[in-house]
Amino acid sequence: MIEADRIISGQAKVDEDVIDRAIRPKLLADYVGQPQVREQMDIFIKAAKLRQDALDHLLIFGPPGLGKTTLANIVANEMGVNIRTTSGPVLEKAGDLAAMLTNLEPHDVLFIDEIHRLSPAIEEVLYPAMEDYQLDIMIGEGPAARSIKLDLPPFTLVGATTRAGSLTSPLRDRFGIVQRLEFYSVEDLTSIVARSAGCLNLELEQQAAFEVARRSRGTPRIANRLLRRVRDYADVRNGGIISINVAKQALSMLDVDDAGFDYLDRKLLSAVIERFDGGPVGLDNLAAAIGEERDTIEDVLEPYLIQQGFLQRTPRGRIATSQTYRHFGLQKLSD
């Protein structure tokens, strides 16, 4: 099973973009959660508008599904400018980036998702553009080739990444504002679910919103995805009304448990407990035991389990915590 196949994946799915745009907040006033980020961005945006400057270049990082793209669009809306969107893997040639930069209007936002995947050649074009609002272009080939400089309008580059550590230092250092998005509280996710239900004209009980939120792994994208699937269940089984019981039944059908775990999460934790006596167990042994690639365990499964205190990573291997035993209704044996 790959990450994109899981209903509790933080990665975006191809068919979700249209619906996500419909329920996505447009302004900071509608943006739920991330209070420190929201307060800081409110100050930075208002200051830039008072000075009639472009906002400083902004790097947003954090796990998938926490609202990096949403925040980039909010920045453009609050500044009253256009946003042009691309991604690191799409920008294969320097000319692709040059074309986007030369079409920007003053103070526009250029949003590059997965910015850690930019090639070195593209980064070289970005450096003078970010620092001096200039574009260095090579004209001609061979001995006759020469470099010319084009002036660019002041603009804001917003970069988004799930892997801030993979950015080169020269690129990272050129961002004047760096914001990290954290996992959301259940209370904030409940508000997000209720807001999304309103946008979709759903009849949703408050307790049902909480039930969806607490199984959403701290991630708005997962909360909204689960809400849509619960809506499907309610339309067929309960005349479209999403009660607490309907929400629980739908989520049970989807195999998402009270902790937001799916089959793969439970398979990993069960293997650590049952096959390796709670650990420590090495990554290769664990991968072989559950039939998954070690990269899948490290990049997809472990981060949330570790963050929530269900799995501990030690020099000797992975260990199931007391919380894991309680989740499965088991008693942890004393050392």
UniProtKB/Swiss-Prot annotation:
Domain of life: Bacteria
Annotated transmembrane regions: none
Keyword Ribonucleoprotein among UniProt keywords: no
Annotated positions binding DNA: R294, R313, R318
Entry's free-text remark on domains: Has 3 domains, the large (RuvB-L) and small ATPase (RuvB-S) domains and the C-terminal head (RuvB-H) domain. The head domain binds DNA, while the ATPase domains jointly bind ATP, ADP or are empty depending on the state of the subunit in the translocation cycle. During a single DNA translocation step the structure of each domain remains the same, but their relative positions change.
Pfam family, one: RuvB_C
EC number: 3.6.4.-
Region (Head domain (RuvB-H)): 258-335
Residues noted as binding Mg(2+) in the record, renumbered to the chain: T69
Keyword annotations from UniProtKB, A to Z: ATP-binding, Cytoplasm, DNA damage, DNA recombination, DNA repair, DNA-binding, Hydrolase, Nucleotide-binding
Family of the protein in this entry: Belongs to the RuvB family.
Class of this enzyme: hydrolase
Taxonomic classification: Bacteria, Pseudomonadati, Pseudomonadota, Gammaproteobacteria, Pasteurellales
Protein's name in the database: Holliday junction branch migration complex subunit RuvB
Start and end residues of each stretch annotated as Small ATPAse domain (RuvB-S): 185-255
GO biological process, one term: DNA repair
Complex and partners: Homohexamer. Forms an RuvA(8)-RuvB(12)-Holliday junction (HJ) complex. HJ DNA is sandwiched between 2 RuvA tetramers; dsDNA enters through RuvA and exits via RuvB. An RuvB hexamer assembles on each DNA strand where it exits the tetramer. Each RuvB hexamer is contacted by two RuvA subunits (via domain III) on 2 adjacent RuvB subunits; this complex drives branch migration. In the full resolvosome a probable DNA-RuvA(4)-RuvB(12)-RuvC(2) complex forms which resolves the HJ.
Subcellular location(s) per record: Cytoplasm
GO molecular function (one): four-way junction helicase activity
Region described as Large ATPase domain (RuvB-L): 4-184
Reactions mediated catalytically: ATP + H2O = ADP + phosphate + H(+)
GO annotation, cellular component aspect: cytoplasm; Holliday junction resolvase complex
Function field: The RuvA-RuvB-RuvC complex processes Holliday junction (HJ) DNA during genetic recombination and DNA repair, while the RuvA-RuvB complex plays an important role in the rescue of blocked DNA replication forks via replication fork reversal (RFR). RuvA specifically binds to HJ cruciform DNA, conferring on it an open structure. The RuvB hexamer acts as an ATP-dependent pump, pulling dsDNA into and through the RuvAB complex. RuvB forms 2 homohexamers on either side of HJ DNA bound by 1 or 2 RuvA tetramers; 4 subunits per hexamer contact DNA at a time.
Main location: cytoplasm
Residues reported in the UniProt entry to bind ATP: I23, R24, G65, K68, T69, T70, E131, D132, Y133, R174, Y184, R221
